[in-house]
Every structure is written in structure tokens, then in C-alpha cells.
Amino acid sequence: MRGERLAIVFCLLTLLLTGCKKQHSQDAGLEQCNSVYFWRTDLKLDSTEKAFLSQYHIKKVYCRYFDVVMNDDATEPSPNATISFSDTLPTGVEIIPTIYITEDCMHKPHKNLAKKIVDRVLQMNKTNDINHVQEIQIDCDYTSRSRKNYYQFLEEIRHHLSPITYQLSTTIRLHQLSMPAPPVDYGVLMVYNTGDPRKWQERNPILDYRDVYPYLSQLDKYPLPLATAYPVYQWIRNIQNVRVEHTVEAEEILKVKKAMEKERPSLSRSIITYHIETDNINRYKPETYEEIYRH
């Protein structure tokens, strides 16, 4: 009888240690830091934005370099809306070139697309004297239709980055948590654009806890290291000649953050806000940003 009890205790301890090991392996190599997205077409920071970087100890800026969209005759992907660099980031703040790719670009393979993107990023860094880059991020709302081609494309990106030892990351939407993890070093979980824009009178399309809730149970078992990105922006649009403004209340952001970190505590390690802009900075109180960036 005593032997049976000891065996049960041993099994329970093994399960506990296995669970801890899994949690540790999810987060291996993920730096604890505060970051922002920069999503404008000219890298130029005003005094409020520079003060924000300093006040909240921002270490990384995920900077959109350009989009990749299908060309006019829908035959080949091509770059669009390339950023200009009128300013530089403060010393000690790392820039992460980020490329947004429309999902239709991944409906079929495109020869040399990965090489063209890597070469273009490296050339932009060289032309604009941007040094000490260590990573590229790819942003794509891939679906079950485009996933296979997208993952192969990411493998090709990794191949072309390997000689310069860059890391590769990608964005992860909530609906993508049910798919196999992409072949990257880590993902950024986009905790925004969670709702149906057509149902804006019922729920906030930027972020609503009710839209996040169904995905909470998938967080802990997702194998890829994850940073999290929260919305601080406003979405203004015209619906039937009526100006509609979508803004997420601070309480809703923090409610979602708390629920996600309850399921996977390590999501507090690397926090990003989307996106840095003076209006967005002034939209929320300093204590709200302190809570968003709390580790």
C-alpha cells in the first residue's frame, strides 16, 4: 500500500515537472522587454513620442518598412508604401524591420520573393545607415488556404537570413492559434482586430473580451514563444455617411491582458503596444500604460 502511494506521488511530481519544463521551453530565448509598433510612412518622432520611449523603457520598435501586395494585374507580389527615414531612434532602442504581406500573396508560391524581401530590407538598412539590426518580422493574416505556402515562404526567409544570423518572427492572430506553429523564432500575438467590423454596433471590432475568451484555452499549449501586442489606437470610419469612432476602453485592455496572463503567465514577459503616435499616447493615462507594460 505504501509503495502504491509513493508511486502515485512520484507520478504527480513527474507531471508537475513536465508542465514546468513545457512552460520554460515555450519562452526560451524570449527577452523580457517593452516595445512598440511604428506604422507610419515616415520614421519621424516628435518630443512626446521620444519621451514615451524613455518613460516606459522601450527597447524595441517594430517598424513597418513596406507592404507587399499583389500588383495591378494580380500576377506577382510587389512592394508598396515604403517608409522614409527622416529621423533615427534614440541610442539603445533596437529597430525591427517589419513587412506586412497581404494574404492573397500567399495563395501560390512566388519564386525568389523571400530573397527579394531580405535583399530589400538589407539595402534599406545600408542606405539609411541603420545598424545593429538583429531581426526581421513578417506580418500576414494567413489562413488555412495560404498557410502551407506562407510557412514555406518563412522557411525561405530563414534560409536567406542565416548567413547574417538575424532572428525571424511573425505575427499570430487569435484564429491562427489552432494551426500548427510557423517556422520562426517567436510569434507576436496580435490582441486587436478581434471582432467583426460589420457587427460594430454589438461589439468593439478592435478588442472585446467576448471575442478573445474562446481562444484563452489554446494559449498554454501553443508551442511557440509569444510576445503580446495590445491596441492603443483609434479607428475612425464612415458608415452610411456617419462618422464612427472605435476606441478601446483602458479597462477592457487590462481585463483581456489579465485573462490571457492567467492562462499563460509568461505572456507578460514581452509586451508591445500598437502603435506609437502622440494621439495614441495621450488617449490613455500614464497608469494605464504602466499596467499594460507590467511584467
Region annotations inferred by a language model:
Residues 17-19:
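C-terminal motif of bacterial Sec signal peptides marking the signal peptidase cleavage site
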Residues 21-23:
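Bacterial signal peptide processing site
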